[in-house]
Amino acid sequence: MYSKKYTSFVIVLILSCIISTCTSNQISEDVGKAINQKLNENIEKVEDVVVQFENVANQVIEELKVEHQRQELLGEVKHDSLRDSATNYIWGLLDKIQSYLPKDNNKVSKVEEAFSSGQNNNIGSSIGDSTGASTSPQFQSINGLSGASQSSGSSTGGTGDSDSKTTNEAIIFSSKVSTTDRQESIIGQVAITAKDSLGATITGLGGVSSTAKVGGQITNGRAQGQVITGGDNTGTVGRGAVTTASSVANTVGEFLGGSRTGGSSSAGTVGNVISDSYTSIGKIASGNGNSLSETIGTTGDTLAHTFAGTDSVGVTGFHIITKTFNLIAGGKFNSDQQYIDKSYGSIPSQDNEEIKKRLQSAHQQLQEQSPAIYQSMKSEDLKNLDDEVIRNTLKEMQIQRENQDIGQQNQEDKEQLIDLQNREPGLYKNQQDLKQEKRANQQELINYELNLQEDQEQYELLLDQLYDEQQQQPQKVSNKQQLQEQQINSPEDIQYQLNHLNQPFQDDYHNDQTEELKDDDYNFNDQQINNGQFENNVEEFPDLNDANDNFEQVNNNNNNINNNNNNNFKVDKSKKSAQQVEIALENERLYLQEVEDAPERLYEEIHNSNLNKAVQEAEEIERQQNGNGSPAVNSHKIVTQMGNVENNEITNEQDAIEQAQHLQRIENGEDIDEYEAAQHEVAFLDENEQDAAKLQNEMDQLELLLEENEEEQFSNKNLQQLNENENQQQQQGQQQVQATNVEQQIVEQLKVIKEFQRQDQQKKQKIQQENDAVYLSDVEKAQLELDAELAKNNKQENQDENLVQEKQQSPDQIKNQLKNIQHEQQIQEQQDKLNQEKNQQLLEQEQNQK
């Protein structure tokens, strides 16, 4: 019986343990499933937020690269244009956010509420708290968008709720640091806080004495909450106790860029990649550090400042859009100098101290140098001064950083070169040889260019010399005896020589004068225009009288020579008389004697004198001709002609010698047949002597007629040549008259231009005087109004003094007097400002006149 009871008790106990264990395991399993389900839902929401920001950031970066490349191709890279492109995507993001808001007539307040902090169900608080770092800088509000129970936020974080707006306009998205601003029923708050959260709602899951803890301790030896959250059984995700290794919260924290303390941030996380700093997603969006938001924003023209405007929260949508495109896209309305590159990233504390020192120094220096100006400056002027100092300081810092980067890069290059020299001496030597060879080639190219330049200069100098020689007066032929000694055998040669002497000069002169008239080669200045003096390159037409005289003398001499030769030939062939034979024999004897006595003299006179002189004269003429036929070809013609003359003379000389030898043989009786034939011929000639005399008379008459015809023909040719020369001189005179007319026209045009310039200058001066008069009249009018206002105030002051004397002043009267005094001070300030503007205008006018 006992054994049965004991056995039953053991069985019941075992069954109880089994049931208890199964129940505990089932409860733990159910709790784990519920927790995992809710946790996964919230993690998905967080991941969605991260992905959205990551996509936007990547899209902005890619578009910035494309825009930057496009502007580099166009050569007009401007930071404000890049900023405009980036802000366009921010506007697109705002439109997407607006689509998720309640459709309540799309009021602007909905956008403001969406980006406000400290409100339930708003995007700013939800995204910030969903990161699991509720006390860290969060993406909770847009700078300046604050209202009742809303936090304006700032780059360094606010300490609570307030209605004031931040003064730091350099940050688009502000952050907030507060431990008392947890809200209920928001994303993240539901999952991470103890009150009304997931842990508290599901039967105290994650609590200190919750079933999860008990079940975890019983089954796993560790609380489920601690395993999931890494915290001390609080059920939160990413709170201060996120330190346990390999916990879910710690992993999520690293993925998002770090916990609130930044201790779990590591390279490769989403937050670190986007912001390049150990900050959370909330801090990335808030603009702290080298973030996307701060890079897009610039001083004084951020999206937040534009969205908030300068008035209260309740600005109209039209006002918001107008100010947005007027200020954000400021490149269309303002100069580039009004913007600075915000790619400097986060400003270190020592740089902030330097900026503060420079701001203080600038204010102190201005106050010491111009106290009146400093006192009259408004808050806006002081703000512009501060912005300028900040811009200059940041630019100097950026230049210093770039110089440091360049120095570091140079040092790295040197180290790489040394390493290359140590590892690969041959390759290093080859590179050095290539560099030296490149330098040598460059030096050789430079030397070649220098030599080429010198050759070009020498070539231009030779061209100038040839041009000067061409422009000189042609040499006149004055040595008539030299031309008379030339042996020219035909009138064609004489005509060729005449054309050779004179025609090139006429053609060259005509061509040169035509080119000079086309080039309009006139040099004159104002003084010469007024004095009627001009410089030109018109030359006198060369005088051809001497050349014509020489030609006439040479022609006459050669005609006489030709006539004598023709007469001897005709007489010998017609008369056939012994007397002529004897005369011819005697002439041949004398000629042979002369040849025997002075052969060298004859050769020098015929060959050297005639030939060389003709060739030299031809070459001299061709050098002055400049283009009318090749000098070498013409000289060759002269040489050929003179060679023919020489050959003819040698042939005549040989014939004369043979004829003299033949006559000598006849005279000596060596050739009887020839002697008898000569006797018969003499007899025959005697019989026909009368006929020969008659024929001689006829021949003489014919010769006289021939001479008269040749003289008349030559006279006609000479007269024709003279007429042509006269016509050319007349044409040249007409061209010179035309050139003079052109000069006069140019002078008249210059006078008209000068008169027009003088009238234009007078008009400009008159307009300037009228503008000055209008400005002075406006200033005087304003001065009169100020004087009248002062007089009115003085009168009122006197009346107030009289009232004071009559009765005791009341508090209201004292306030009125204070208002009058302030009004007078304002009027005085306006008067000082007008005087300052007047002085500035006068200074600018004097500078313009100078």
Swiss-Prot record:
Induction: By cAMP.
Biased composition, class Basic and acidic residues, residue ranges: 787-798
Keywords carried by this UniProt record: Signal, Sporulation
Gene Ontology BP terms: sporulation resulting in formation of a cellular spore
Polar residues compositional bias, start-end: 131-143, 801-820
Signal peptide from the UniProt entry: 1-24
Top-rank taxon: Eukaryota
Compositionally biased residues, Low complexity: 119-130, 144-154, 837-850
Region of interest: Disordered: 119-167, 787-850
The name this protein goes by in its record: cAMP-inducible prespore protein D7
Organism: Dictyostelium discoideum (Social amoeba)
Lineage: Eukaryota, Amoebozoa, Evosea, Eumycetozoa, Dictyostelia
